[in-house]
């Protein structure tokens, strides 16, 4: 296919997969779509439930986090995840599990007042704040299709988009109820 890399891996946390399917109403009889595959940061995460240690936890603000120092390498999390998201570093002598971190190393961090020893002006502070307030995938999305906020904010936005454009979207927010709900939601 056209997707590169083909699957999630210890170094690929988010995958945009290209899919083609038959549609007799489209020119050439084929339609295509792009589907994002990544950790959905479940409300009731199977990886957390399956872990015999405290390597996995769900944070109150939504993200499912992994602590490699607590991991014993059993990989039960891989077996439990319905989306096959946690992946092992198979090329390592002591493989750890890897997945989307929800950019926990940057989201919500305090904004510095200086950069490279120079005090930042208001415009620089605003630009810097904008870059650390959202996960990298949201910041980098060239189609501006991704949004970031609380689950309630995102559900409200999703339902508004469906109501505003019923011709464009299927009347369903994926992740609202599936497997107990997720903090990452999809429209199609």
In which residue ranges do the predicted regions lie?
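Non-ligating segments of multi-cofactor redox enzymes
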Residues: 1-188
